[in-house]
Structures are given as structure tokens and as C-alpha cells.
Regions:
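Hydrophobic alpha-helical connector segments
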Residues: 70, 84-113, 162-169, 191
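Amphipathic alpha-helical packing segments from all-alpha helical-bundle domains
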Residues: 77-80, 107-110, 126-153, 163-167, ...
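N-terminal intrinsically disordered/low-complexity leader segments
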Residues: 1-20, 157-159, 206-210
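Amphipathic C-terminal alpha-helical segment
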Residues: 107-110, 114-117, 145, 166-186, ...
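Short coil/turn segments at alpha/beta junctions that flank glycine-rich nucleotide-binding fingerprints
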Residues: 35-39, 111, 153
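Helix-turn-helix
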Residues: 20, 24, 28, 32-66, ...
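Short, hydrophobic secondary-structure boundary micro-motifs
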Residues: 115-118, 130-131, 159, 209-210
């Protein structure tokens, strides 16, 4: 038991001091998985891409499956973070909509290849299925709660029940994000159009500048 604690302490200390190497491994793993798939990809592929030794890999991750799970959690957190809009007036639905929709679309476009792999793994891996469900459902339910708060305060008159509206807008964002993944130059136009559609469906009260 003491040996286990010592090993964990060493690993934790190195996590703090060598965070850049861990970050490179994560970025490399996402690129390798996107190119090769989870099955064919190897630890050697990841370390070569990251320019980190195999020994360095095992300081942070026990296997390629573990780093894949860490990536899945990171994607989930990226979508949740897209709904957090620091520096934006949360009482302004227009500003919140533009910022959060832009962040969500950008995150989905960036992680699209990995999302496809996550969906595949979710069919056979219960732990991955739970993560996949969180990726899809947590942002939607959080968005629905936000719509309800706006409605209760008289700042919105949504065209549908909040959860249904949140799902619909999420689907629109995903569709546009897929297009942006192939055509990045359309990002700003997409954010503008999706934001306009969302605000119309939300029945947002016009802001003071309008």
C-alpha cells in the first residue's frame, strides 16, 4: 500500500511540473484518433505525434483507452464551458446567444472527428455511453434552464417548451458546425445566422440598441 501511495505521489508531482507534456499528448492523441481511429491507433503513434517518449506517456496515462476517456471528458467540459460567457452581460440574451452559440459551434467543429469515435464507443462501452449521454444532454438541459429563467423574468417568449427549444437549437448548431469543419471561412456567417434564428425562436425582448 505504501508503495502505491508513493508511486501516486510521484505521478501527481510530475503532473504539476510537466503539464505541457501532458497537454501535447492529449492534442496528439486527438489528432491520431481522428486520423486512424481508436482501434488501429497505438501509443507509439501518439508519442511520435506529441514528440514525447513512451515512458513519458505512461507518466500520465495507463493506456490509449485511458487517454481516450480523458479526451471524452475534455470534450464534455468544452461544451459546458461554451455556455459560460465571462465578460458578457447575462441579462442580455442577445449577447449571451452570440457568445455561447459561437463557442459551441467552434468546439463542435474542432472536435467533430473525436465525437464520431465517441458515439461509436458508446454503443459497446457503458462508461463511454454515460459520457456520451452527458455530452449530448447536459448542455441541452442547462440551456433549457436558462430559457426558463429568461421567460420567468419577462425577457423571452419562447416559441416552444424550453427543453424542446434547447434541443432544436442544439441540432441547428451541430449542423452548422459540421459545415464549418469543412469550410472554416463560413464561421462568422454561421454564428450570425444561427444567433438570429435562435433569438427569433426564443422571442427575446429587443435589446436597448435596437
Amino acid at each position: 500500500m505504501a508503495r502505491t501511495h508513493k508511486a501516486w505521489a510521484v505521478r501527481t508531482a510530475r503532473d504539476r511540473t510537466e503539464a505541457p507534456a501532458r497537454a501535447r499528448l492529449l492534442e496528439a492523441a486527438e489528432a491520431v484518433f481522428a486520423q486512424l481511429g481508436l482501434g488501429p491507433a497505438t501509443v507509439a503513434d501518439i508519442t511520435t505525434e506529441a514528440e514525447v517518449s513512451r515512458a513519458g506517456f505512461y507518466v500520465y496515462f495507463a493506456s490509449k483507452e485511458e487517454i481516450f476517456r480523458v479526451l471524452a471528458v475534455r470534450v464534455r467540459d468544452a461544451f459546458l464551458a461554451a455556455q459560460e460567457v465571462p465578460g458578457v452581460d447575462t441579462d442580455d440574451p442577445h449577447a449571451v446567444a452570440e457568445a455561447s452559440i459561437g463557442a459551441f459551434i467552434a468546439a463542435y467543429a474542432r472536435h467533430q472527428p473525436l465525437l464520431g469515435l465517441l458515439e461509436q464507443q458508446a454503443r459497446t462501452d457503458p462508461a463511454m455511453a454515460q459520457l456520451w449521454d452527458e455530452i449530448r444532454e447536459r448542455p441541452v438541459h442547462r440551456h433549457a434552464r436558462y430559457i426558463r429563467r429568461l421567460t420567468d423574468r419577462g425577457l423571452a417568449a419562447p416559441a416552444a417548451e424550453p427543453l424542446a427549444l434547447a434541443r432544436a437549437v442544439g441540432g441547428i448548431c451541430v449542423e452548422f458546425a459540421r459545415r464549418i469543419a469543412a469550410h472554416p471561412d463560413t464561421y462568422e456567417d454561421a454564428v450570425r445566422e444561427v444567433t438570429a434564428m435562435y433569438l427569433h425562436l426564443l422571442g427575446a425582448v429587443p435589446n436597448r440598441q435596437e
